[in-house]
């Protein structure tokens, strides 16, 4: 079966209030400080990440293919959207408690989703990860889930979900019964 075309590029979620967020650059002290902390924690990081701000608050982070392995500098941020795809990230405990709605972590080394438990994630992209379990996604409002090429076999964590799109090509999933009643 052919693999479907890649989904569209990361688009940060709409900000919760006011005007659209701006792209934080060197002129933003908060972004400059975060870039420096990311570089210190990840020596191979060259500062190519982009951050979206509104009213001085960082709301979204675009960090694909940035050689990040340590996400600790992001701990405590109230991010609504994040793309960490293509990074050698193994664990995501520092994302715990974030109000993430969109999270892209394709082609990472992440194997545990439990730190995401309770997050309001609507779109989650896990393509190409070594993930074997969806534990942690129970009861989440996920509508779009991309998990092509993962090692997940059991999708029971998605039972009762509001799932509208599920991409699971090249996975060993064989039982779709947990999705009965999904929209």
PLM feature spans:
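Concave beta-strand-loop units of leucine-rich repeat
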Residues: 43-69, 76-111, 115-183
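The feature captures the LRR N-terminal capping module
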Residues: 4, 12-65, 164
């Amino acid at each position: 079966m052919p693999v479907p075309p890649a989904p569209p590029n990361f688009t940060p979620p709409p900000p919760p209030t006011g005007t659209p967020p701006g792209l934080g650059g060197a002129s933003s002290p908060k972004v400059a400080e975060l870039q420096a902390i990311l570089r210190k924690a990840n020596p191979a990081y060259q500062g190519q990440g982009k951050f979206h701000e509104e009213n001085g608050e960082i709301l979204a982070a675009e960090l694909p293919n940035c050689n990040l392995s340590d996400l600790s500098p992001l701990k405590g941020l109230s991010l609504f959207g994040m793309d960490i795809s293509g990074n050698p990230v193994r664990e995501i405990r520092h994302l715990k408690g974030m109000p993430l709605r969109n999270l892209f972590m394709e082609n990472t080394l992440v194997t545990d989703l439990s730190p995401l438990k309770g997050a309001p994630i609507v779109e989650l992209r896990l393509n190409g990860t070594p993930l074997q379990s969806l534990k942690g996604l129970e009861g989440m409002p996920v509508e779009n889930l991309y998990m092509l090429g993962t090692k997940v076999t059991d999708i029971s964590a998605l039972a009762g979900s509001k799932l509208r799109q599920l991409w699971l090509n090249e996975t060993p999933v064989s039982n779709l019964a947990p999705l009965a009643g999904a929209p």
